């Protein structure tokens, strides 16, 4: 039997994140071969992943990253089973590492095949499922490109938002962050009325009409009043028309124009866990 040193165990632990005893067992089984021990730990991860495939992984960390020139951003969620794991510093660090890699890709499928320290992201997730003992997977994958992109991550990494602005100007970074905070807090259904799907519009009109009938309003007045209520729905639930949370006397669209008269919010992405 090969003699396994503490230094070898520690090296394997740093490389894989596995526990000390698991690393020692893998090195013993691999007769001291470092690469062989890594492979054994990966196989263990695959077995654990297969057993936990049907488990709910609604906890985790939502992370937003923006590239160096603020023209592209990405949000990923690294999902797990428990809040205990989601708050672990190593888990959050891994989520941030994944997000940095994700900036280079436009789809979740491409990202999962990307290299992560010598193995694919997908294989790393399987490995970590074995190491942590919980189902670990990538949930959301969103990208946004615009003349200027900013971000905001809410405390606890449960909500992440990207905001795209129409141009890069002095104050754009703060404006994008403030609008992202707005989206995090108020959860708008769309950027503006054009972005609200027809199903939602039809539902809101029907709810309004049903309420008006219960109030005894004449049938010939329902359409006009319902349209007024729909406009109120747009004002309350679309990002650019919402009252700005830091100054409710102006809308979000009005707020960004205080930064630059021609500045507009052109897109946003929001991911929330739980």
Curated annotation (Swiss-Prot):
One Pfam family from the record: EF_TS
Compartments in which it is found: Cytoplasm
Key words of the record: Cytoplasm, Elongation factor, Protein biosynthesis
Coiled coil: none
Positions of region (Involved in Mg(2+) ion dislocation from EF-Tu): 82-85
Transmembrane segments: none
Claim: Lipid biosynthesis is one of the keywords in the record: no
The UniProt record lists the keyword Cytoplasm: yes
Superkingdom, natural source: Bacteria
PROSITE patterns, per database record: EF_TS_1, EF_TS_2
Gene3D superfamilies assigned to the protein according to its UniProt record, in alphabetical order: 1.10.286.20, DNA helicase RuvA subunit, C-terminal domain, Elongation factor Ts, dimerisation domain
InterPro entries found in the cross-reference section: EF-Ts_dimer_sf, Transl_elong_EFTs/EF1B, Transl_elong_EFTs/EF1B_dimer, Transl_elong_Ts_CS, UBA-like_sf
GO cellular component: cytoplasm
One Gene Ontology term of the molecular function aspect: translation elongation factor activity
PANTHER family per UniProt: ELONGATION FACTOR TS (PTHR11741), ELONGATION FACTOR TS, MITOCHONDRIAL (PTHR11741:SF0)
Function: Associates with the EF-Tu.GDP complex and induces the exchange of GDP to GTP. It remains bound to the aminoacyl-tRNA.EF-Tu.GTP complex up to the GTP hydrolysis stage on the ribosome.
Similarity field: Belongs to the EF-Ts family.
Protein name, per record: Elongation factor Ts
Source species: Christiangramia forsetii (strain DSM 17595 / CGMCC 1.15422 / KT0803) (Gramella forsetii)
